[in-house]
């Protein structure tokens, strides 16, 4: 699942990963399953946070990046009309500023145009040129984090209205600690350390998220339908 997302977003991704099973295979010391692309040599930016504050950490990454970027966009807008060679490039950049995929090429073109310009205003923008492109912010974690230990923070982030994405690896148990029942476990489910079976139903995290009215929720299974999972 993580590989599929990185194939879709690649170097445009920022990932905040909760401690747990997804961080064990996702960032154990000396190895990493994440890689760079052949064209630019860059890949996803990945960082591991605590179990209990991963959602807030991911939101902080997004707010911090977008705050710097908003300041740069203001400076870019101020350049309009001062240099005829820059105007067309600036217009294309501003038209796509809220689209991660569409903004990639215009951002690179803007950086090249600013470097060619050499004016004082362009130099000021180029100091933080890595913030010009629109990025995709992701919060990764297992069901122990999303349904239980980190749920309060996750709910806060989802209620904030900020542009972040959340991927929950729902194994329906605490996988990292050996197999205890979690709030994601189904009624009657038997785990290694919950042999008596769970007596209550699975928490419906998807339905809870949908009650906000503006959150897009999808549940996928790669083995069931790869095409639908990609959509």
Label the model's feature ranges.
Residues 9, 18, 95-100, 204, ...:
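Alpha-helix initiation/capping motif
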Residues 23-51:
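Terminal amphipathic helices with adjacent charged low-complexity linkers/tails
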Residues 25-26, 35, 117-119, 124-231:
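Thiamine diphosphate
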Residues 1-19, 23-30:
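N-terminal amphipathic, basic-rich helices that act as targeting or association modules
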């Amino acid at each position: 699942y993580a590989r599929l997302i990185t194939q879709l977003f690649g170097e445009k991704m920022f990932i905040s990963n909760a401690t747990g099973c997804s961080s064990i295979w996702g960032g154990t010391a000396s190895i990493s399953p994440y890689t760079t692309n052949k064209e630019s040599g860059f890949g996803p930016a990945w960082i591991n946070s605590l179990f209990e504050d991963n959602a807030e950490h991911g939101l902080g990454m997004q707010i911090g990046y977008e705050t710097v970027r908003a300041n740069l966009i203001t400076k870019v807008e101020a350049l309009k009309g001062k240099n005829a060679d820059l105007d067309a490039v600036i217009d294309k950049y501003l038209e796509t500023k809220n689209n991660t995929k569409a903004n990639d090429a215009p951002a690179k073109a803007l950086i090249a145009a600013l470097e060619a310009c050499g004016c004082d205003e362009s130099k000021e923008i180029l100091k933080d040129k890595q913030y010009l492109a629109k990025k995709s912010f992701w919060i990764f974690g297992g069901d122990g984090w999303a349904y239980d230990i980190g749920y309060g923070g996750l709910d806060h982030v989802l209620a904030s209205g900020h542009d972040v994405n959340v991927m929950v690896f729902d194994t329906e148990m605490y996988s990292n600690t050996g197999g205890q029942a979690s709030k994601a476990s189904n009624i009657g489910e038997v785990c290694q350390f919950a042999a008596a079976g769970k007596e209550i139903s699975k928490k419906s995290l998807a339905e809870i998220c949908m009650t906000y009215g503006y959150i897009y929720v999808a549940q996928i299974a790669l083995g069931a339908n790869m095409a639908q999972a990609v959509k």
